[in-house]
Amino acid sequence: MAAYAVAGVAAFAIAFVALCSALGAFADSQQHSDSLQLSVVEHKDPFYVLLIGSDSRKGTALYTGKASDHAQLDQHADVITLVRVDPANYQLTLVTVPRDTVLPGESSKINDTLVHGDPMQTVDAVERLTGVEIDYYLMTTFTAFEDLVDALGGVAVDVPKTVKVPDPSTAENVTVTKGDNQTLDGSEALVFARARKEYVNDQDAVRQMNDRQLEQSIIRTVLGMSSESEIDQALIDLRNNTTSNMDMGKLGYLAMDFAMHESDVVLYSCTGPYSGDVNGSGLWVVNADAEAWEQLMDVVSSGGDPSGIVAEPATP
């Protein structure tokens, strides 16, 4: 395991950028992209999208090609985020699935479902954990995250503690300094999203909390876009840097409503149960809490605000 949070956490953010690009950018770009055809959507029922962040080092300066090195020839779903999209009410609900979760009757963590490179295995595991049907998935990587954040002109976040983590793209350390309302570029945002070891308690839960802050900033930035050139570039980055089974035409049609009702968009975010312990092999694991997940998903599926159902960790 790397000394810092597994790099896939950054991919969580890029995947969310991808979703938001589809929700916010299609409306303005539909007349400017020959390759994107909108499809009429008759029903506006809520649906679920799974955002998957791969921790593969391929394409980065940290890639060695050695099977003995972490996340070289295999990969893990180290960011797993379930998003409920409610087009009728202009609502997005973001639920983090802790990567160390172990489902009942299984011995491996849920992030191991991506080892063979099939995101549908991760989708299946999350469906079993949460009890909801997932319509689509989006999977992405490090460099895509950095490219999209840079294309957005950066994202503003509150940094609770100074962090220093290697940027996988360059293998060089990047420092993000504590402070409120800081605009981070792609490299800095990646570092902020990855940092875990710097926090004393509930390290991965704190990382998830930081990531949700980052993603909310990204969402608002994308939904508020007014430059056609920026939107077009974000869409190009989306298509080039993600793997997905999403019907972009249908999602684009729905996006027109979101774009026209930007001020009405409601964004909820929360974490799934993350309390865990060290197992016999010395690994941190989170045993799936079926009752807690059921309580959480009942609120999410009904369109309610799930924040606080699972208490957030203390701010570092």
Region spans (language model):
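Non-catalytic, solvent-exposed segments at the cell envelope interface
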Residues: 1-316
